């Protein structure tokens, strides 16, 4: 594939020729948001519920005390890596910042669960869960008619699309 705009951007900036991505989404997403690798931010597994580890129990391994609440820009939540996001830096320098899709940087009920916390001015469907409850607008993306979440992975911010046939 030809990607002339991306190649031009790389020529003007910095191109990384050696990189690492975790096979689990949360650590890599946290790395992209903070610029730190997983060994530095210590988010080494997926995040979901506040103060809840997602590691399998092992009789053989001693699992380290990792940052299972994800990343945030403010102090106050234990087991959270604190950093300024690159999005906040862009916003502070006049860019309009939009997030669309999965977020999954912090556990539910922590600052890191919301893309707005990291400097995004617009958020379309981003939240703490690593995927949508449903892709179907006929099911209100996991909400009942009163707007109450019916599923853990209910997708926020898509109310105007409920019942429209819009598939995400």
Predicted feature locations:
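Formylglycine-dependent
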Residues: 48-96, 103-168
């Amino acid at each position: 594939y030809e990607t002339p705009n991306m190649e031009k951007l790389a020529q003007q900036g910095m191109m990384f020729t050696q990189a690492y991505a975790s096979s689990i989404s949360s650590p890599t997403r946290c790395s992209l948001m903070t610029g730190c690798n997983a060994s530095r931010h210590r988010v080494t597994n997926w995040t979901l519920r506040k103060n809840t580890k997602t590691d399998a129990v092992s009789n053989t391994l001693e699992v380290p005390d990792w940052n299972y609440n994800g990343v945030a820009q403010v102090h106050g939540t234990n087991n959270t890596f604190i950093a300024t996001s690159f999005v906040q830096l862009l916003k502070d320098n006049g860019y309009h910042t939009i997030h669309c899709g999965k977020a999954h940087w912090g556990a539910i009920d922590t600052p890191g669960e919301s893309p707005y916390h990291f400097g995004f001015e617009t958020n379309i469907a981003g939240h703490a869960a690593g995927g949508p409850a449903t892709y179907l607008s006929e099911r209100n993306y996991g909400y009942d008619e009163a707007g109450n979440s019916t599923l853990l992975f209910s997708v926020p911010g898509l109310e105007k699309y409920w019942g429209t046939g819009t598939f995400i």
